[in-house]
Amino acid sequence: MKYIAIDLGLKRIGLAYSAHKDLVTPLKAVERKNRDQAARDVKKTLIEWEVDAVVVGIPLGGSSEDEMRRRVAHFMNLVAFEGEIFYQDESNSSIEAESMMRGEIKYIRDGRIDSISAMIILQRYLRQKC
């Protein structure tokens, strides 16, 4: 099964891909100018990589969980993805990503950290599933 993970942010959307449970690759992040443009760009990536399922990171257990689920559901509606959508706890994934990249891109905001976060989210999902 082919997966893409999405780390949905206000400025950038991190993406990561896996066709095998032991290998997850960060992809180029989507710059988010507006919702419609971001949804089109994400959909294009999903089609290009021929994915079967999407794993979306959401913060579980916090007071904002319901609101985030609503926002994610709205965004995925705009993407109009026909495959399966799974949710995975994204807690601390950005902190982990920054720790992994420490020193390399401290001041660069090009989406690499966002896509590393998506990679971590997908790794967590695949570890729990398999």
Curated annotation (Swiss-Prot):
Predominant subcellular localization, coarse grouping: cytoplasm
SUPFAM superfamilies, sorted: Ribonuclease H-like (SSF53098)
Classification via Pfam families: RuvX
Nuclease is among the record's keywords: yes
Source species, domain of life: Bacteria
InterPro entries: RNaseH-like_sf, YqgF, YqgF/RNaseH-like_dom, YqgF/RNaseH-like_dom_sf
Subcellular location: Cytoplasm
Gene Ontology, cellular component aspect: cytosol
Enzyme class: hydrolase
GO biological process: rRNA 5'-end processing
EC number: 3.1.-.-
GO molecular-function terms, A-Z: nuclease activity
Keywords: Cytoplasm, Hydrolase, Nuclease, Ribosome biogenesis
Record-linked HAMAP family: Nuclease_YqgF (MF_00651)
Function text: Could be a nuclease involved in processing of the 5'-end of pre-16S rRNA.
Family, as annotated: Belongs to the YqgF nuclease family.
Protein name: Putative pre-16S rRNA nuclease
Annotated source species: Sulfurimonas denitrificans (strain ATCC 33889 / DSM 1251)
Lineage, broadest ranks: Bacteria, Pseudomonadati, Campylobacterota, Epsilonproteobacteria, Campylobacterales
